[in-house]
């Protein structure tokens, strides 16, 4: 008798697969639209599961919110937010008011969504240009892709602190374990071909062998490995590279 494979168990959403959100201070997002004024950095904290430091900011009206800390931000620094905010490191500006060439992070895709782009440690986006007639701002994302976003959206000036974190090696498997635990990742991951046949479609046999591509319409439990792929192997990669050229 077979058993449910790992991807099926993960899809069910058991407690061991859920992200431990109760360990976090709260959502990292901007205050409601229309919020403007000055504030200051109350504290810079570490939040389990996030790969960048988080700044706790308190505004003049008493409202507090969490935002990713900019490189060089310090406790007690004055922060401006709104249309009148100057493009200084740590300030939350409206994209339509940001000068061309400004480095920003935690960029909103739609006004009021709290920030969607450039949120990882050490990343930033660049304001490339403005389209006032269409109320759009052109932003170059960390991937190099340019995107038009609503000019009424907000972003923080600077780059996210915590850059270079991936340059430090893990060294021990135990560190990887605790990193995965903070993010609710399954660790260690066992290869399907190393399992028994009752546990995975790639398991079993007197020797290990690769699986075959699976149809997109295959039922859950069969959908592992290459799903609906047109071609596989080294020749496939070469063919795609030639097509791009």
Curated annotation (Swiss-Prot):
Residues 196-226 are annotated as: Disordered. Pfam families: Ribosomal_L2 (PF00181), Ribosomal_L2_C (PF03947). GO terms for cellular component: cytosolic large ribosomal subunit. GO terms for molecular function: rRNA binding; structural constituent of ribosome. Keywords: Ribonucleoprotein, Ribosomal protein, RNA-binding, rRNA-binding. InterPro entries: NA-bd_OB-fold, Rib_uL2_dom2, Ribosomal_uL2, Ribosomal_uL2_arc_euk, Ribosomal_uL2_C, Ribosomal_uL2_dom3, Ribosomal_uL2_RNA-bd_dom, Translation_prot_SH3-like_sf. Coiled coil: none annotated. GO terms for biological process: cytoplasmic translation. SMART domains: Ribosomal_L2, Ribosomal_L2_C. Belongs to the universal ribosomal protein uL2 family. One of the primary rRNA binding proteins. Required for association of the 30S and 50S subunits to form the 70S ribosome, for tRNA binding and peptide bond formation. It has been suggested to have peptidyltransferase activity; this is somewhat controversial. Makes several contacts with the 16S rRNA in the 70S ribosome. Part of the 50S ribosomal subunit. Forms a bridge to the 30S subunit in the 70S ribosome. PANTHER family: LARGE RIBOSOMAL SUBUNIT PROTEIN UL2, RIBOSOMAL PROTEIN L2. This is Large ribosomal subunit protein uL2. It comes from Pyrobaculum neutrophilum (strain DSM 2338 / JCM 9278 / NBRC 100436 / V24Sta). The gene is rpl2.
């Amino acid at each position: 008798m077979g058993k449910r494979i790992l991807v099926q168990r993960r899809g069910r959403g058991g407690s061991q697969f859920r992200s431990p959100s109760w360990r976090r201070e709260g959502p990292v997002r901007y205050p409601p639209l229309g919020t403007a004024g000055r504030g200051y950095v109350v504290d810079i904290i570490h939040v389990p599961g996030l790969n960048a430091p988080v700044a706790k900011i308190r505004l003049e009206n008493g409202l507090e919110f969490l935002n990713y800390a900019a490189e060089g931000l310090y406790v007690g620094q004055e922060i401006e937010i709104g249309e009148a905010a100057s493009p200084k490191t740590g300030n939350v500006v409206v994209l339509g008011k940001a000068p061309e060439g400004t480095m920003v992070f935690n960029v909103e895709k739609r006004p009021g969504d709290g920030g969607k782009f450039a949120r990882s440690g050490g990343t930033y986006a660049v304001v490339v240009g403005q389209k006032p007639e269409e109320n759009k701002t052109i932003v170059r994302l960390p991937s190099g892709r340019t995107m038009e976003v609503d000019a009424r959206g907000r972003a923080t000036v600077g780059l996210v602190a915590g850059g270079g974190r991936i340059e430090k090696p893990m060294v021990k498997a135990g560190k990887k374990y605790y990193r995965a635990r903070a993010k609710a990742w399954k660790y260690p991951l066992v290869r399907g071909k190393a399992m028994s046949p009752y546990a995975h479609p790639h398991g079993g046999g007197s020797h290990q062998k690769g699986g075959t591509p699976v149809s997109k319409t295959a039922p859950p439990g069969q959908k592992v490995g290459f799903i609906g792929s047109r071609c596989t192997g080294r020749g496939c990669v070469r063919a795609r590279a030639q097509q791009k050229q």
